[in-house]
Design a protein with these regions (language model features):
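Extended, charge-enriched "interface" segments that sit outside catalytic cores
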Residues: 1-103, 366, 371-379, 386, ...
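Catalytic cores of large soluble enzymes that bind and process phosphate-bearing ligands
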Residues: 14-21, 31, 72-86, 117, ...
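Active-site phosphate/pyrophosphate-binding segments
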Residues: 182-366, 389, 436-442, 446-447
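Low-complexity, glycine/alanine/valine/leucine- and proline-rich hydrophobic stretches
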Residues: 374-377, 385-391, 398-404, 410-416
Length: 447
């Protein structure tokens, strides 16, 4: 049976058309590409992002305190827990009402300003864990048009979280400037209403954020993997440190599974191999991410960036043009909304697109959709009502969406995408297309 279970999570790939021969070919490729060695390199801090000569250690953000992981001779886990401790202290003070605005009133609104991974991940996680939010606090995530958000807020009780890895991102700093000017114009009197999350602490301080209100992360944390770091401080303020640690624990459990399970019993590896078969053997150009729990409203957008920015590459690590296809198009929507928008195309369109369902185990509607997409519903008498079937799908099932299961789901996809990058021979941890676009935009702005 094509089902793998781990820690209450079920991965069902019985509705795919992955043959034994396909699987053997891909597992052979995994060994040829030294997946086991590359996996070890990532977890132990080797500088596998060759473009920037950086380690790739988002996994260290959720490591146990007792672990030792070294980059350039320095134990990074100790630094992670130092920042986590500061985050916890700050979050506890905001939640308890001890951290007040300039007029002495407790904080009621947290405005998180960021873009890309500094926005999509934290927004998704904070929305997914809404059941755990502090009743006094409301989070507002902004990447553009902060003016609309500011109309609803009071400067006395608003805290701004400015997130930029370099603290030079023009879109983010532009929105932060608007927020600062609004704050001052409304009578705001204290810089304590602003905190900064960045690699560039000096840049945040120069911008005007008090140093005690800055929270560090590191160059070995990619933006699209940064929610586990201080970038997640808005989430921690809303859900509390205890739930944030449970979220980290979920990711850590998948890390252990990914490192230890045999390839064909390894959920992220099998997710990757199935995705590669769909892309390279069956030539499917895309896949749809369809979560059914309403808490996962923003999951497809988070996944879209994670996958397409990581594996949307056409050059191998050796600088040569890739042979064949790499990362697919990723799109998606909540299950019931998707059923009443583009499921018509999925069921009866001329293109076949695999679906990756994420659901709770009690959702029969999702399983019914997967069955019909796979098996079809024949109706020769009325061709317009004929459902041809032959549409592959996978199911990731959890009992419920909790901080722990959310962490597990996210880590599964992170590792899936890493495996695919290894097998395609590309660097999943740079984004040269994005960076070149920024440089060109800056040049045009100067003209």
């Amino acid at each position: 049976m094509k089902v793998i279970k781990f820690n209450g999570l079920v991965f069902d790939y019985s509705r795919t058309f992955l043959s034994k021969s396909n699987l053997q070919t891909l597992t052979k490729l995994a060994r040829q590409r030294d997946l086991i060695g590359r996996r070890k390199d990532m977890f132990t801090g080797e500088k596998i992002n060759k473009t920037s000569n950086w380690a790739v250690l988002h996994t260290a953000l959720r490591a146990k305190r007792s672990e030792k992981i070294y980059v350039d001779g320095k134990d990074v886990v100790a630094g992670v827990y130092e920042v986590l401790g500061r985050m916890e202290d700050f979050s506890d003070r905001v939640r308890s009402g001890k951290y007040c605005g300039y007029s002495g009133k407790p904080i009621t609104d947290v405005v998180h300003i960021g873009i890309g991974g500094s926005y999509l991940g934290p927004r998704m996680v904070t929305r997914a864990l809404a059941a755990h939010h502090h009743p006094r606090l409301t989070a507002h995530f902004v990447s553009d048009d902060i003016q609309e958000t500011l109309k609803r807020l009071s400067p006395e009780t608003t805290l701004f979280v400015v997130v930029s890895k370099t603290f030079t991102t023009p879109e983010t700093l532009g929105q932060a400037e608007i927020a600062y000017n609004w704050f001052k114009a409304k009578g705001g009197k204290s810089a304590k209403h602003f905190i900064g999350v960045t690699v560039n602490i000096a840049g945040a301080v120069k911008w005007g954020i008090p140093e005690e209100n800055t929270f560090k992360f590191w160059d070995w944390v990619g933006g699209r993997y940064s929610t586990w770091s201080a970038v997640g401080i808005t989430t921690m303020m809303l859900v509390g440190a205890e739930n944030f640690y449970k979220f980290l624990d979920g990711g850590r459990k998948i890390d252990a599974h990914f490192r230890k399970a045999p390839l064909t019993k390894n959920i992220p590896v099998m997710m990757a191999l199935i995705g590669m078969a769909h892309r390279n053997f069956f030539k499917y150009p895309a896949y749809a991410s369809i979560p059914y729990p309403p808490q996962l409203e923003f999951f497809p957008l988070w996944l879209q960036q994670l996958d397409m920015e990581s594996n949307g590459k056409s050059v191998e690590l050796n600088g040569k043009k890739v042979k064949g296809s790499t990362g697919p198009i990723v799109f998606g929507l909540l299950g019931y909304d998707a059923q009443h928008s583009f499921f018509q195309w999925l069921h009866q369109g001329t293109d076949i697109v695999p679906i990756e369902f994420v659901t709770t185990m009690d959702n029969r509607n999702c399983i019914f959709q997967a069955n019909i997409l796979h098996a079809g519903e024949k109706n020769a008498a009325e061709p317009q009502n004929n459902l041809p079937g032959g549409r592959p799908s996978t199911l990731l099932m959890v009992k419920e969406v909790t901080p722990e299961t959310l962490g597990m789901l996210m880590a599964l996809y992170e590792h899936k995408i890493f495996v695919q990058g290894v097998l395609w021979g590309i660097n999943s941890f740079d984004q040269c297309g994005v960076e070149m676009g920024k440089l060109i935009a800056k040049k045009l702005a100067k003209k």
